Amino acid sequence: MEIKMKNNFETVIGIEVHVVLSSKTKMFSSSKSSHTDPKNTNISPIDLGHPGTMPLPNKRCIEKAIVLAKALDMEIEKNISFDRKNYFYQDLPKGFQITQQFHPIGKNGKIYLDENNFVDIERIHLEEDTAKQTKEDDGTILLDYNRSGIPLIEIVTKPCIKSSTEAGLFLKKLRRILTFNDISDAKMEEGSLRVDVNISVKPIGSKEFGTRVEIKNINSINNVEKAIEYESNLQAEQILKQEEVLMATKRFNDKTLTTEFMRLKTTNVDYHYMVEPNIFVRKISDDFITDVIKNNYTDIKSIEADLLKNNVSQEFINLLMDDYELFQKFKFINDEIKDCNEVIKWLCVEFVGSLNKVNLKLKDATDFQLNQLLKMMKYLLKDASINAKQGKEIVKLLIETNKDIDTLIEENNFKQITDKNVLRPILEKYVEANKPMLDQYDSRPERVEKFFIGMVMKDTNGQANPNVVTEIFNEILKLNK
C-alpha cells in the first residue's frame, strides 16, 4: 500500500514557524523577556492589557527582523506598522494580539536547500506572544503572564515543500540562520522555535490541492518529518478508500508516532484585523537598514566555505552548523590552535564523547573544562610535551575529576620524555637486540620503524615522544648504512 501511495500521490506542505526573539525585554513593554523565571514576575500593566497603557515597539526586535529578512533575501518593508488581531481567549488579556497583518517587515524570500532547490518564504512578521496557560486536574485554568508580550517573529512558507526530508532540511537551514545571527536560540525543546505544518495530498499532476490538515506545535525536527510521513500516508490511504479527508487541526503524538484529531476547521476565522492606533507608522531609511545589516548580519555561506577550504568534511561541517553552541566552542579553541580538523577531533569526538560516557551533554561542560581542553591541545600540538594516547586519557580524566591538566599530568606521570640523551640508549638497546629486524628496513620500512618505536613506547610506558624517537631512529639508520 505504501509504495502504491508514494507512486500515485504527491504531498504539498506549507510551514509556519514561530520564533522567540533573543531580547532582554518584551515586544511592547520594558518587562524582562524570560519564561523561565518564577510565574507572573516579569509583568507590567502593558503585558496585562490594562486600559490606557501604550505599547512601544522594541527597536532591537525590529533590527533582528531586518537581519532575518536579509538572510532570507526578502523585500524589507520600510514603513514599520502594527495591527490588531481580534479574538477572545483566556491567554489574551487585551482581547487582541498586536501583529503585522497588512505590512509584514519582510516578504518574498527563499531558503536554499542546495544549489538547485529552495523553499519560497511568503512573509515574516513581528508579533507578541500570549500568556501561558496550565490546566489543573479540576479544570481550573492558570495563567502565567511572563510569556505575555514576549517578542515573536513568524516565518510563513508558501505551500511548496514536497517531502518530509525537504521540510526537515528547511528547518535545519532556518535554525542555522536564527542562531548564527543571534536572532533566537531556536531551541525547540524549550519552545523558542514552534512549528505548525499544513499538509495536503493530491494525485500526481493534479492542479487542485487536496484538503489541508494542520498539525500544531511539533517539538522537534525529527517529529516534524515523522508527522508529515504519517499524515501524508494517512490522507493518501483515505483517498484510495474513497473516504473524506476532513479539514482539521491535529497534534502529533511522539509516543505512537501518529497524528491525533483536535478540532474541525469548519470556516475561516475572521479576526477583524485593524491598524493598531496606538503605534504610529515608523519610516526606516536605507542607511538605517544598511547599518543594521553591517553590524549584525552573519553570512553563513562564507563560514561553510572557510571550513571547506580547511578540508573539513561535509559531515563535520553539518555537525558544527547545526549546533551553534558547539560551533562557538570550536571557534574559541580554533582561534588559538588554528587547525580545524585537530580541534574537531579533540572537541567533537574526544571531549563530547567523554561527556556522553558519564551522561552529560555539551551544555553541561564548564568554561574551566573548555579552557583545560585548550591547554591540553597546546601541550599536545605545540609543545609536544604529551602524546595523543595520553591526551585521550587526560580528556577522560578531565571530565571525570574536573582537575586541571597539570595536576592530571603530574598524578598520572604523563610528562613526555623528549630528551634524546635519555631515549637514544633505550632505542639502541632494542636495535642491538634485533639486528635481523633492522636489516629488513629497505624492504619493509614502515613495519620496521613501527616495531622499534613501539618497543621504546612500551619501555617508557608511553611517555616517549614518538617524533623524537623517529628522529633518533633515522639517525641510527644512517650510521648503520
Swiss-Prot record:
Highest taxon of the lineage: Bacteria
Span of the signal peptide: none
EC id: 6.3.5.-
Database matches in PROSITE patterns: GATB (PS01234)
GO biological process terms on file: glutaminyl-tRNAGln biosynthesis via transamidation; translation
A GO term for molecular function: asparaginyl-tRNA synthase (glutamine-hydrolyzing) activity
Keywords: ATP-binding, Ligase, Nucleotide-binding, Protein biosynthesis
Classification via Pfam families: GatB_N (PF02934), GatB_Yqey (PF02637)
Cited SMART domains: GatB_Yqey (SM00845)
First-tier enzyme category under EC: ligase
Region Disordered, annotated ranges: 29-50
Catalyzed reaction equations: L-glutamyl-tRNA(Gln) + L-glutamine + ATP + H2O = L-glutaminyl-tRNA(Gln) + L-glutamate + ADP + phosphate + H(+); L-aspartyl-tRNA(Asn) + L-glutamine + ATP + H2O = L-asparaginyl-tRNA(Asn) + L-glutamate + ADP + phosphate + 2 H(+)
PANTHER family attached to this UniProt entry: GLUTAMYL-TRNA GLN AMIDOTRANSFERASE SUBUNIT B MITOCHONDRIAL AND PROKARYOTIC PET112-RELATED (PTHR11659), GLUTAMYL-TRNA(GLN) AMIDOTRANSFERASE SUBUNIT B, MITOCHONDRIAL (PTHR11659:SF0)
Alphabetical list of NCBIfam families matching this protein: gatB, PRK05477.1-2, PRK05477.1-4
Family according to the record: Belongs to the GatB/GatE family. GatB subfamily.
Assembly behavior: Heterotrimer of A, B and C subunits.
Protein name: Aspartyl/glutamyl-tRNA(Asn/Gln) amidotransferase subunit B
Organism of derivation: Malacoplasma penetrans (strain HF-2) (Mycoplasma penetrans)
Name of the gene encoding the protein in the UniProt record: gatB
